[in-house]
């Protein structure tokens, strides 16, 4: 079961995702990212975008995944509410393939909040918790 939350971090907003698997934690932190920008509960799954990124480590993989989502948001004006993430290790690198589900931003419907300017490595952590679940977090540039 995945869940997400925002956490206070000085003048910024931290985003944190939890999941039974690493993939679910990545999905949850992506939902948290978009909930910083809009009310994700009002976003419908009308469109899908496929994403593929590779990186040397999990932190770079999370950064690249969220950065790609932010680029799609900026260029196409899409907001997302749900994700299907698959992560595998190939030739010593991590590969992430994902589907992102959402729709075009509607200012009246989606209740815009903050603008996320960039993904950062600030306070980024990806770890397996003592209960066996996974957690991923970071503080984006608002």
From Swiss-Prot:
InterPro entries: Archease, Archease_arc, Archease_dom, Archease_dom_sf
Record keywords, A-Z: Calcium, Metal-binding, tRNA processing
Pfam families found in the cross-reference section: Archease
First and last residue of the signal peptide: none
Residue positions binding Ca(2+): 12, 141-142
SUPFAM superfamilies (UniProt xref): MTH1598-like
Family classification: Belongs to the archease family.
Its job: Activates the tRNA-splicing ligase complex by facilitating the enzymatic turnover of catalytic subunit RtcB. Acts by promoting the guanylylation of RtcB, a key intermediate step in tRNA ligation. Can also alter the NTP specificity of RtcB such that ATP, dGTP or ITP is used efficiently.
Name recorded for this polypeptide: Protein archease
Source organism: Pyrococcus horikoshii (strain ATCC 700860 / DSM 12428 / JCM 9974 / NBRC 100139 / OT-3)
